[in-house]
Amino acid sequence: SVVGEMGMYPLEEAVKLAESFSTRLFVHSTNPPGTMDELVSYLRKGDVLCHMYHGEGENILGKNGITPGIQKARERGVIFDVSQGQGNFSIPIAMEAIKEGFLPDTISTDLNIENWNHPYIFSLLLTMSKLMAMGMSFEEVIRRVTSTAAEIYGEAGKMGTLAEGTCADITILECQQKEVLFRDKYHNELIGNSLLMPMATIIDGQLFY
């Protein structure tokens, strides 16, 4: 754990700080200093648990599936985000959680300057394609990167929609039917049969790509 012997103390203080600024908290949950149930017990409605499908240390699965604390956290409004990253995603854990119906609220990549070209992650579309290979539908995946994300972050009706009068930020995709091999840092592999590819990007009504 990155917090070492400090345990949950940094998280407790972070929650207090977030409350003082009336803002939400984003929490890196990989390899937590305690159980995931303990970690999410500190989180409030609107706080975001990142790396929800990580496989390092304690995770969201217990002996009987999704742990009770994780279920309760979702019920009280904690947001669960994929935040895949280079090493914060386990294919078996994600597949089991999705099988149980524990889908992400939002889908993001955790891309940064060090992992932007890594084969495990590479792009948001690759992450979306991977989740489709695990059982999520195209519509479920699209909502979690558009309208649902906009609603959670207070931009409903402004972003993540094609409604008349809204900002025309649009990505045109093609769902190519082909065999795709997905991997994670633990050397787990998954074969999918479709890959989302970008065909055009429109920004504020202007063709960009």
Q: Language-model segments: which ranges?
A:
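Short glycine-rich loop/turn motifs that provide flexible caps or phosphate-binding loops at active sites
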Residues: 45, 164, 204
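Active-site core of metal-dependent hydrolases
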Residues: 1-118
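Short, solvent-exposed coil/turn elements at secondary-structure transition points
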Residues: 55, 86, 147, 176, ...
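Residue-level recognition of alpha-helix initiation/capping sites
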Residues: 8-9, 64, 88, 122, ...
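Short secondary-structure transition/capping segments
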Residues: 38-43, 71-82, 126-135, 156-160, ...
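His/Asp/Glu-enriched, well-ordered alpha-helical/loop segment
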Residues: 92-176
